A protein has these predicted regions:
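A transmembrane-helix-recognition feature enriched in membrane-embedded lipid enzymes
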Residues: 2-50, 99-108
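Soluble catalytic domains of membrane acyltransferases
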Residues: 23, 43-161
Length: 161
């Protein structure tokens, strides 16, 4: 991929390893800053990290997380990044309405999903990422669950498994 004249769709469908080196380097610096910030703010840790960071070469994984706040996205994304895994988060397409957010999410390898529909474009992009050996992050509830008493409903994501 070239550095300029790329659309977000080019990044949604391209292997992370083919992203321009400047983009990958920028992502690494931003991840470092976010890792330090999130560790200082929330003092999180990954339990059973060896299970999460263990991977089979050439085979992608679907990482499924509960979504209780926006903070866990930082924790999960940075922990996996510094554990040697390049994760492709699936994000709601409403975020892509902002050009800056759309640009940023596409450069970290995010894949937009049109919620409430059978978004085959998203599923195909995630499927191709998995076939290339990349990892996909999904929050299957489709939204944040504010209370631990409420049992989360699973709206999507299991088509990838």
């Amino acid at each position: 991929m070239r550095l300029f004249k790329q659309t977000p769709e080019d990044y949604y469908n391209a292997p992370y390893a083919e992203f321009p080196a400047v983009i990958r380097g920028t992502v690494a610096v931003v991840m470092g800053i976010l890792w330090v910030f999130s560790k200082l703010m929330w003092r999180w840790k990954v339990e059973d990290a060896d299970l999460l960071f263990e991977r089979q070469e050439g085979r992608g994984s679907v990482v499924i997380c509960n979504h209780t706040s926006m903070a866990e996205l930082l924790a999960v994304e940075t922990a996996l990044f510094f554990g040697g895994r390049r994760i492709r988060p699936i994000f709601k397409s409403e975020f892509a309405k902002s050009k800056i957010v759309r640009w940023a999410f596409s450069r970290v390898g995010g894949i937009p999903v049109e919620r409430g529909t059978a978004d085959m474009k998203c599923l195909r992009a995630a499927q191709h990422a998995l076939q290339r050996g990349e990892d996909v992050l999904i929050f299957p509830e489709g939204t944040r669950i504010r209370s631990r008493e409420i049992k989360p409903e699973v709206h999507g994501g299991f088509a990838l498994i």
